[in-house]
């Protein structure tokens, strides 16, 4: 485990993800037309966990995809021509779908902006909603999460780490000073 203070243990993470799943269902009145897209890599694992809960609650399949934002990041443009590009896998149409974009930690908003650009290059959804396990504040862009597991105000020097087990299930959220 990383050094720091555990702010969500395994049980707390499970409760937060279950609550997020229920909030998604309430906001969207079920799963019809709903898809989840996780941001590589932590967001992908969390999206799969949320989809499992949605499917358990609703008894219906919910498509899940993943998006890599490497080519959309604004902090690397022109600076790193040989960035390793991960896989974007969205094996379904986004046209007119309600997309829930999932990430582990919301900080400046720049990752989310990049992910929205990538999603729009794959189609025009009816709407994009944002689900995050942790919102730590310090936004640089006008972006907010629709579904939040835990708000954790931090200093700029602190970091939030979401830890995963060998099966890519979230185990803890740690505040590192």
Swiss-Prot record:
Cell membrane listed as a keyword: no
Gene3D superfamilies: 3.40.50.2020
InterPro entries: PRibTrfase_dom, PRTase-like, PyrR, PyrR_bifunctional
Pfam annotation, one family: Pribosyltran
An individual GO BP term: regulation of DNA-templated transcription
Domain of life: Bacteria
Motif (PRPP-binding): 99-111
Keywords: Glycosyltransferase, Transcription, Transcription regulation, Transferase
Enzyme Commission number, as recorded: 2.4.2.9
Function: Regulates the transcription of the pyrimidine nucleotide (pyr) operon in response to exogenous pyrimidines. Also displays a weak uracil phosphoribosyltransferase activity which is not physiologically significant.
Family from the record: Belongs to the purine/pyrimidine phosphoribosyltransferase family. PyrR subfamily.
Protein's name in the database: Bifunctional protein PyrR
Organism field: Geobacter sulfurreducens (strain ATCC 51573 / DSM 12127 / PCA)
Designated gene of the protein: pyrR
């Amino acid at each position: 485990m990383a050094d720091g203070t555990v702010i969500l243990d395994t049980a707390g993470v499970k409760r937060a993800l279950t609550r997020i799943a229920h909030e998604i269902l309430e906001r969207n009145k079920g799963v019809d037309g709903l898809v989840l897209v996780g941001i590589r890599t932590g967001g992908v694992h969390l999206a799969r966990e949320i989809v499992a809960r949605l499917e358990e609650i609703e008894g219906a399949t919910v498509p899940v995809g993943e998006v890599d934002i490497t080519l959309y990041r604004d902090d690397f443009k022109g600076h790193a021509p040989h960035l390793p590009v991960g896989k974007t896998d969205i094996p379904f149409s986004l046209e007119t779908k309600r997309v829930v974009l999932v990430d582990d930690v919301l900080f400046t908003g720049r990752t989310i902006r990049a992910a929205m650009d990538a999603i729009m290059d794959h189609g025009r959804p009816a709407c994009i909603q944002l689900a995050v396990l942790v919102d730590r504040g310090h936004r640089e862009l006008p972006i907010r999460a629709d579904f939040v597991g835990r708000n954790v105000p931090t200093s700029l020097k602190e970091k939030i780490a979401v830890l995963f087990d060998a099966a890519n299930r979230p185990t803890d959220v740690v505040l590192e000073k």
